[in-house]
Structure formats: structure tokens, C-alpha cells
């Protein structure tokens, strides 16, 4: 029996009603300690229990080797303090951040809320982090302490104090500090929790950012852009065009949504207000279908030429398979992992292997875009 899913999670979410941000802080501290003691008995037990290695799940994409397609989404390890632990928890890659050039406290608390009835979370964190320089220092130390077995991405955001017209330089300053320490990089212009940030998805604004980054990117690190689920098809098509123009490694689809339709939660206990009255982005199950629609659209528009990392509402092997067959080469989890617990990654990987066997596939790559291919 999965003790976390059936006992600990319901207790924390529905009975004790622990503050989600406090619980997250304690968890990341524990993971940070484990990350700094890579040969510990605890790490060995975690790896044995939670990891699954199978050549059918391996892929080489944009020059990087991924042992499996399930990654940790940005937002959990904002400062890269636990970068060395994620492979032991079964992940095939992990994305650190979002990190900004200037350290910043984020938005006032409370700013993170669980919506158990919807299997969702609402957050308005506001890119709280210690800054790019602090992350760089930590990752240099991490490289000395352990050898990462999985690709590590770094998600870059705009500092709140930086005016929108200076955003490109702000992203560039962070990239310069971190470019030798991450395996791939993500331009986050889609969080709803930094004033004006989503306007950077506009073609002219985004073009300026990508142009500066690629000029600096002499070692050809893979660069992605992460987009919002709330964009219309025309705006997404413009971003696809920019991805081709600036030779991006791919697109991450999607960030959290500002939509509130269909939610079962009437009142958030911490504030006494409805989700409709609270600012922030919704993640988890309510995002699942829309993020898959965006993945499908990108695949159809590009015929699979631009790799997609799919994220949003993944809780089960079926959810993961749906994202992959819609066109995602890789997937990321966060909210689902919080609800389902640490065994979720292994369960998804086992489920994907079963799907491959059922379809007579030798590699997970054969499943990417299968839904669209089969309709031709």
C-alpha cells in the first residue's frame, strides 16, 4: 500500500491542514541535506525504491541523455539546493528555479493554496528566490560533491524590479552567471504572478530576449520558452515561429492558468475567499486538458520538428501517455507529485512500459505524437 497517498496526504491536506508553503520548506530542507550526502544509506534506499531504469524509456534529445521522460517541473527547487537528489527520486531530469537575476522575496504570504476537491493548487509565489548568483554558487558546490545522473535545467524569470523594457538584459545577466552550470535553460515569460510578465510572450518582446540569449549562447546550450495555457492559437503560432527563427531546443507547454471555470472548491480555508477572488495561477487536474490541447496544436503545426515538454495535470500513467501521444517528447510533474506522493514517478514509468508493450513499441520515442500520426 502507498502510505503517502492513502494516509499521509489526506491527513496533511484535509485534517491537519498544514500550511502548504511551510510544508514545502521543510521538505526542500530535507532534500537539500540528502543532496549533500549522496552516499548515505537513505539515498540508496530512495533510489532502490523509487527509481526504474529501462532502456525502452531512454531518449537522446538536443544532445542530452534522458534515462526516462518524467521530469520535475520548475518551482519545487527554486534555488537549486537539492539538485543532486532528484535522480534518486526516480526523475529522468529536473528543472531548477524559477531564478531571477536579483534576489527577491516574492509576493506576501499566504501565497500557496491547496484545492483538494479539484486535485489542484493555486499559487502566487512571485518568483521568490535568492538570485542567480546564489544559485551559481550552490551549483558549483553541487558539481564538486556529486555527479548528476540526469539533465538539470534552469528556469529563468524576470526580476520584479526590472522594467519590462529592460527584461532582455535581465534574462541575459542571469544566463551569463548560470550558462556553464545548467544542461538546458528555460525562458519563463508565462507566470501570472509577476506584473506584466506575460506581455513578454508578445513576439517583439520575446524576440529581443531570445536574440540576446542566443548571441551569448556560444556553447549552444538548449534553450526553451515556457508558454501560458491561456494564449490563443494565433499567439502560440507566433511563438512557434520565433522558436524556429532563434533555433530554440523546444517549447514547454504549459505554465499555470488564470482561468477558474469548472472548479469544485467554493472557499479557500486560509483566506475565507473563493478561488475566483484570489489572484494566482491554477495547476493540477483543472489544467490537464488545456495543456494537452496546446501540446497537440504545437505538434500539428510543426509536424514534430520542435520538441515539446508537456506539463499540466499529470497524475497517472494514462495522463502521461496522453501528453506523449499528443506530441510531448518529455513530461514534467509537480502538483500531481504532491498529491500522489514519491511513488508516483515509478508508477508512471511502469505504466508507460506497459503501454509500449501493448503497442509493440521498442522505444518511448515511437509513442510521441502517436495520436496525430494514427489519424493520417
UniProtKB/Swiss-Prot annotation:
Subunit structure: Monomer.
PROSITE patterns assigned to the protein according to its UniProt record, in alphabetical order: DHODEHASE_1 (PS00911), DHODEHASE_2 (PS00912)
Protein name: Dihydroorotate dehydrogenase (quinone)
Positions annotated to bind FMN: 74-78, 98, 155, 188, 226, 254, 284, 313, 334-335
Keyword hit for Ligase: no
Subcellular location: Cell membrane
Record pathway: Pyrimidine metabolism; UMP biosynthesis via de novo pathway; orotate from (S)-dihydroorotate (quinone route): step 1/1
Superkingdom to which the source organism belongs: Bacteria
Cofactor detail note: Binds 1 FMN per subunit.
Membrane topology: Peripheral membrane protein
CC cofactor: FMN
UniProt entry tagged with the keyword Membrane: yes
Residues given in the record as substrate binding sites: 78, 123-127, 188, 193, 255-256
Entry GO CC: cytoplasm; plasma membrane
PANTHER family: DIHYDROOROTATE DEHYDROGENASE (QUINONE), MITOCHONDRIAL (PTHR48109:SF4), DIHYDROOROTATE DEHYDROGENASE (QUINONE), MITOCHONDRIAL-RELATED (PTHR48109)
